[in-house]
């Protein structure tokens, strides 16, 4: 379980919000106008990692090849999120060798074991734990073989291709292990008939602050700034993590302001991107990211996950900001100009 509270994330985010407002005010970006209304909104989230209340495990293999390179075989597909890179980093860190010495084969049913799907924000936490275990086993085995081969105790594997290739040849000739299996099952308990139980072994917590500017003539909503704060356990790869958060923020912006599947008599009437609108780079505002690290006792090196949590609070934080700016309650998304106009008209009639 996370060592951080949502309050920690909210407090850190609030500090960033105040700093950004002060900077924008000094630079003349917050000029008041009767036409435009601004406000911040915030929303928080927590998401369990893995398959809810079900068995969730991963098996991987790690091998020292005769070339001196290590080869990781993992079933989880890298669909662009960079998990192949993160898994190699975990293996390299546990082995104590440079990252470039680890190669990876992923999602090849002929060669890889079942490590589960790349869903449910589970790859880093569950598959990564299996990778760490495999690397630990292989490292121990290889250090023992190195002692037998050279007659001296080694505290670490030498990061040298020639030395590792010679060690691999020795292991082959003396029938020593060149491969290790890692497996990890997320701690959880099946849900009872009331739907209660320990559904997840770990949770990712996060908050998003969004500043909007609403045009009271056209009812168009522009998001001017976003601040995100997430507790991801230990950040294995901060650059990939930042990319995941930016992608989640952009998805949530589209979800909150423009994306809507329209049906008429069971037929989709906006099947093309001329009517099903998506955010572009011009729509995504500057994003200030804050990563507060803790250490999960089960995850690899204390890591958890960030994939889906990054997209969860965004639409709600934008809706809360619009609500604060226009003094209306947002109960439906996307927040189109037509819907916002109707809400303001209804409010004025009540008043």
State each model region's role.
Residues 101, 211, 223-225, 260, ...:
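Extracellular/lumenal ectodomain signal focusing on beta-strand-rich modules
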